Structures are given as structure tokens and as C-alpha cells.
A protein has these predicted regions:
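Bacterial Sec-dependent N-terminal signal peptides
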Residues: 1-22
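Carbohydrate-active catalytic/glycan-binding domains of CAZyme proteins
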Residues: 20-172
Length: 172
């Protein structure tokens, strides 16, 4: 018993000797990286990332000659930023998918909740865009639009579909 007490005390002292205090430093990002000041031949080169900044969980689809990109917005409102591109390099902000409070009830959500991993799809047969996502704490839902620049439907909740990161598949 005495040996066990001495061994335990020795281990506690050794663990305490190895403990170090965490050190934190200040971080600031102003959005003007020097790398973007280096000239490139834009006829066949581009900067990577093509979208610098906060664009988590990207999903894209193509309709005609235009690509559509959506990203997670978590508990920020309006929700799900939408961008368009003709070449997958030059992107233009095109508003948000969830622009009405009725589309995304965020009241009472913590910062770690909200809209995660939206997926955008285009169905050629009915010429309709669909955006499906998970509202953490409220479930999976989708919205649809014939023209993303003119707004999206009210959400259609998938009450019997659990899980996260849903996506649509349209068979040709």
C-alpha cells in the first residue's frame, strides 16, 4: 500500500512538472494578402483560393452556362450566400437563398447551430433549383426556385429524414 501511495505521488509530481501554460497571440486579417498583389497571366492562371474569405461547406451546380454556389451560414441572417460564375474562377455575389425570417427560424439557436452544409441542385426536367440543408436543432428542409434572383419558396421540412448534410439526386 505504501509503494502504491509513493508511486501515485511520483506520477502526480511528474505530470505537474510537464504542464505548461497556454499562450495566446493576437490575430488580425484585413483581407489584403500580399499574394494577390503578385501579377499573373489571367488568360491561363488564377489565384487560389478563387474565393478568398469565409465560404465554408461549398456546394455548386450548373444551369446552362452559369454555375451557382452556396455556402453554410450557421446562425447568420440572411442565410446561405449565393454566388454565380461563368468560368468557376470569377465569382459574383448574387444575394442569399434564405432572405425571410420565416424561411429559417434561428431564434434560440446557439452560434454552433443554424444552417450547415447546404447543397444546391438544378433539375433539368422541371427547370427548378433546389437547395437542401440542415438547420441544426430544427431538422432538414429544402427550398426551391425557378429563378434564384427572384427568391426562393418557403421551406419544406423533411420530418422523417434524420441526419445531416443531405443532398438531392435527379436521374436523367
Amino acid at each position: 500500500m505504501k509503494k502504491l501511495a509513493i508511486l501515485s505521488l511520483s506520477m502526480m509530481l511528474a505530470a505537474g512538472a510537464q504542464a505548461q501554460n497556454a499562450q495566446f497571440d493576437y490575430f488580425k486579417y484585413a483581407g489584403n494578402d500580399a499574394r494577390f498583389n503578385v501579377p499573373i497571366d489571367k488568360s491561363h492562371q488564377y489565384y487560389n483560393p478563387v474565393l478568398a474569405g469565409f465560404y465554408p461547406d461549398p456546394s455548386l451546380c450548373r444551369a446552362g452556362d452559369t454555375y451557382y454556389l452556396v455556402n453554410s451560414s450557421f446562425t447568420f441572417f440572411p442565410g446561405v450566400p449565393l454566388s454565380t460564375s461563368k468560368d468557376l474562377v470569377n465569382w459574383t455575389p448574387a444575394g442569399h437563398v434564405l432572405t425571410r425570417q420565416s424561411q429559417v427560424p434561428l431564434k434560440g439557436q446557439h452560434v454552433s447551430g443554424g444552417i450547415f452544409a447546404p447543397a444546391i441542385s438544378y433539375n433539368k426536367k422541371n427547370k427548378t433549383f433546389y437547395m437542401i440543408t440542415t438547420n441544426v436543432g430544427a431538422g432538414n428542409f429544402f427550398v426551391k426556385s425557378k429563378d434564384p434572383s427572384k427568391g426562393w419558396s418557403e421551406p419544406i421540412y423533411l420530418k422523417k429524414i434524420d441526419g445531416i448534410d443531405p443532398s438531392f439526386f435527379f436521374d436523367d
